[in-house]
């Protein structure tokens, strides 16, 4: 497994122990208690999810002869907290079932929207505009989440309408207002989103980007946002959310999750943990890393690169950190930890062009489902499962935890696209 280590860049370029980073000043944090207090204040807000918890299960891995190599067994009620070390026998990893957070919203999408949705309601947004691919889990999540709150969603999907609506595309169509956009026009996402948002808003409406309604905004945005909140109810208030919700605000949902998991009766604060997560845009992995760093946790994030190059993942990582520090000026960056060890960007076991399914992968997903009751998909979560399985073969000191980001509905789209892979399934 090829490993590439990331570098977290503090915005100031300097760091000693813990620091607050601000555009105007840098206030040193002298103790771990200070950093935890900052995180507590950061998370003292309204949330979209009623509770940050999702089920934690334990997957035992056994070597077998033949082409399958491994068999799996699921313990749906494992020992956690101090009991984890006592029950660690043989090869096993834990799986955080974020795929069970919502029947139609991917787990990682629910986390990314966790902090945004209450702000949308507080500022009386009437319409939300975003974009994604034809089978975008993000647009489906936005459509469902908006409909649940009585808001209108406008979804710009890349390419042409498929002959048969299924999977995330069907969910987006049922819950939101879908427009298919030619690839040439979609290439300039910012202009495309702004133009369509202006059309939705009309002459009397107002348009804002998601970053305009978060803390740390400048004076001009404050005035604009106040006007946005006080508008007459008859006027459209349109909010633009970037593709994939890959903004700094999305990191807050991961902060909330990490704080929850670091409780003593779950993973704890002192136990070494190797997290494994599939990386589409990489936002979830960065959120896990920054949150673990801020809380001083001895965790390592293994991000399996699926859709981009190492250079671009690192660029996105640096952008998110800079944006997060700008929007939340008290952001904590713990240089007491070796940041090169916080996130490891790694290749999946069988690299390929994104979107391609290799022979035998659908069969492996079926095997895992039948043996454990956990459904993974060959596009995303199978890659994380394979990496977690590989890690536990050699890992002795750390606990391995896979974050199941979801993707169940994606299987419907894949079954339509790769018909022979599914029709040839046999016992």
From Swiss-Prot:
EC number: 4.4.1.15
Subcellular location: Mitochondrion
Keyword Signal among record annotations: no
Annotated catalysed reactions: D-cysteine + H2O = hydrogen sulfide + pyruvate + NH4(+) + H(+)
A single GO BP: cysteine catabolic process
Location (main, coarse): mitochondrion
Lineage top rank: taxon: Eukaryota
GO cellular component terms attached to this protein's record: mitochondrion
Protein task: Catalyzes the production of hydrogen sulfide (H2S) from cysteine. Can accept both D-cysteine and L-cysteine as substrate.
Name of this chain's protein: D-cysteine desulfhydrase 2, mitochondrial
Species: Arabidopsis thaliana (Mouse-ear cress)
């Amino acid at each position: 497994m090829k490993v590439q280590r990331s570098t977290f860049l503090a915005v100031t370029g300097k760091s000693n122990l813990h620091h607050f980073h601000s555009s105007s000043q840098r206030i040193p944090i002298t103790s771990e208690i200070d950093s935890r207090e900052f995180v507590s204040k950061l998370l003292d807000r309204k949330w979209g999810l009623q509770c940050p918890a999702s089920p934690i299960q334990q997957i035992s891995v056994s070597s077998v002869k033949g082409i399958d190599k491994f068999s799996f067994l699921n313990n749906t009620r494992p020992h956690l907290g101090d009991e984890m070390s006592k029950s660690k026998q043989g090869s096993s990893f834990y799986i955080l079932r974020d795929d069970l957070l919502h029947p139609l919203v991917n787990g990682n999408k629910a986390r990314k929207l966790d902090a945004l949705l209450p702000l949308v309601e507080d500022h009386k947004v009437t319409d939300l505009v975003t974009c994604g691919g034809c089978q975008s889990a993000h647009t489906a999540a936005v459509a469902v989440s908006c409909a649940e709150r009585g808001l209108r969603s406008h979804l710009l999907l890349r390419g042409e309408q498929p002959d048969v609506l299924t999977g995330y595309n069907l969910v987006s169509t049922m819950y939101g207002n879908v427009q298919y956009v030619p690839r040439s026009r979609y290439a300039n996402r910012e202009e495309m989103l702004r133009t369509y948002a202006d059309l939705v808003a009309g002459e009397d409406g107002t348009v804002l980007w998601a970053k305009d309604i978060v803390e740390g905004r400048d004076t001009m945005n404050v005035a604009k946002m106040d006007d946005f909140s006080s508008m007459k109810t008859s006027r459209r208030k349109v909010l633009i959310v970037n593709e994939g919700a890959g903004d700094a605000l999305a990191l807050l949902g991961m902060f909330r999750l990490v704080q929850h998991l670091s409780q003593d009766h779950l993973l704890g604060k002192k136990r070494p943990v190797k997290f494994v997560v599939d990386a589409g845009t990489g936002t979830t992995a960065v959120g896990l890393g920054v949150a673990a760093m801020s809380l001083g946790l001895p965790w390592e994030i293994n991000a399996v690169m699926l859709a981009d190059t190492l250079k671009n993942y690192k660029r996105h990582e640096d952008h998110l950190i800079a944006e997060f520090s700008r929007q939340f000026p008290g952001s904590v960056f713990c240089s007491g930890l070796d940041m090169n060890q916080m996130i490891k960007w790694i290749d999946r076991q069988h690299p390929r062009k994104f979107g391609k399914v290799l022979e035998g992968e659908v069969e492996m997903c079926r095997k895992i489902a039948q043996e454990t009751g956990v459904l993974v998909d060959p596009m995303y979560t199978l890659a994380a499962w394979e990496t977690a399985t590989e890690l536990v073969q050699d890992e002795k000191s750390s606990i391995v935890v896979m974050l199941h980001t979801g993707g169940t509905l994606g299987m419907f789209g894949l079954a339509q696209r790769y018909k022979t892979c599914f029709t040839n399934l046999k016992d």
